[in-house]
């Protein structure tokens, strides 16, 4: 059990900007607004930031662009981009850098204006030579293949996929910042426009704008800052393929590897987890990740989510902000998993606040079920 860095760093500031529609703002401006909010929330100054971790879908050299825009001359940077899971990976990398003394205050940040820039839900994250002949729509076609295989192999139904979207919407209806609110039934999901069989438009994540950021420092410093520290407990990443045609099994993701390693580092069991934040780009994601992370046996995910089990008041709190399906999804969603987990652990989530939230599992996904990164955050009570 490798717990050498467990509890050594903490998130002390979070910020978001332009959630939903942010007309007139560029990706770097939304990133900058969120970053300044996170730094202020931490009780720090911009000049205190000496480590920058960024991944964007609009900059080839994200840390160069971010640091120039914000006017930071950092001691350490990392621009690792493994898709939407990058920010969970950045939690681990920032912790390592802080513990090694390479920086003293680390900013993790992201921004996108995908919605108001007219972006569609498409991705170039696949090596196109594998699939171009078949004219797929990336990334939806790849996820629909996984959903179809799961339905064929385990008897998962479209109604069970719809349960995921309905549960997410129920959480979103408790979140005033969520972009999509209002009633949504299983029948509504089933009747919505078919995009890539078996996934309808309501099975697919939103296309929104949004910027997000968080600030980490070493644990000893965190105790002297204004907010209750939210401690890094552990993280691990795994990747088995890039193109979905190279995925070993369409029903098993590398979360089955990253999850146990992260859980081992964090020193927690499933029973300890109060909040599960999953990258729900599509309804099948939630089902696959609940299985692969060990909350239910393989093939049981569809039945597991039935009857409001992951909705407000259910047995397992999943995606309490409304997720990528109903809250926010500006191209890369992983940053917003962190923001919601911190909000819940700080007990600042308003109407959707969980009664107990000391340990949160965050799981990021990149590419087409390609990059999987699991992380754990916790309150002081979790140490």
Map each language-model feature to its residues.
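Beta-strand segments within the central parallel beta-sheet cores of soluble alpha/beta enzyme folds
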Residues: 46-55, 77-81, 106-111, 159-166, ...
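Condensing-enzyme catalytic core mediating Claisen C-C bond formation in acyl metabolism
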Residues: 1-25, 163, 194-257, 261, ...
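Conserved active-site "lid/cap" helical segment
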Residues: 1-85, 150-157, 179-185, 198, ...
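Extended C-terminal subregions enriched in glycine
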Residues: 252-256, 260-283, 292, 325-329
């Amino acid at each position: 059990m490798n717990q050498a860095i467990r509890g050594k760093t903490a998130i002390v500031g979070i910020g978001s900007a332009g959630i939903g529609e942010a007309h007139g703002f560029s990706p770097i401006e939304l990133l900058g607004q969120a970053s300044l909010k996170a730094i202020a929330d931490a009780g720090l100054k911009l000049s205190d930031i000496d480590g920058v971790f960024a991944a964007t879908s609009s900059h080839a050299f994200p840390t160069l662009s971010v640091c120039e825009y914000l006017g930071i001359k950092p001691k350490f940077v990392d621009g690792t981009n493994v898709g939407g899971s990058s920010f969970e990976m950045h939690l681990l990398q920032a912790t390592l850098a802080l513990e090694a003394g390479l920086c003293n205050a680390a900013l993790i940040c992201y921004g996108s204006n995908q919605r108001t820039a007219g972006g569609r839900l498409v991705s170039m994250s696949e090596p196109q030579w594998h699939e171009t002949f078949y004219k797929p729509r990336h990334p939806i076609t790849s996820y629909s293949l996984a959903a179809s295989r799961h339905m064929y192999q385990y008897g998962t139904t479209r109604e069970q996929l719809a349960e995921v979207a309905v549960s997410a919407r129920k959480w979103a209806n408790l979140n005033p910042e969520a972009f999509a609110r209002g009633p949504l039934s299983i029948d509504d999901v089933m009747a919505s426009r078919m995009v890539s069989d078996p996934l309808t438009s309501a099975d697919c994540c939103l296309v929104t704008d949004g910027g997000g950021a968080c600030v980490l420092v070493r644990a000893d410093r965190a105790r002297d800052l204004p907010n209750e520290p939210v401690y890094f407990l552990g993280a691990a990443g795994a990747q088995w393929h890039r193109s979905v045609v190279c995925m070993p099994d369409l029903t098993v993701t590398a979360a089955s590897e990253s999850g146990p390693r992260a859980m081992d580092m964090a020193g927690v069991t499933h029973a300890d987890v109060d909040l599960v934040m999953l990258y729900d780009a599509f309804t099948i994601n939630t089902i696959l990740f609940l299985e692969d992370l060990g909350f239910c046996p393989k093939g049981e995910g569809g039945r597991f989510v039935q009857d409001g089990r992951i909705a407000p008041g259910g047995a397992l709190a999943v995606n309490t902000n409304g997720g990528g399906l109903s809250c926010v999804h500006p191209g890369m969603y992983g940053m917003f998993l962190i923001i919601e987990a911190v909000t819940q652990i700080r007990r600042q989530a308003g109407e959707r606040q969980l009664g107990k939230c000391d340990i949160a599992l965050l799981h990021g996904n990149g590419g087409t079920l390609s990059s999987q990164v699991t992380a754990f955050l916790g309150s002081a009570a979790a140490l």
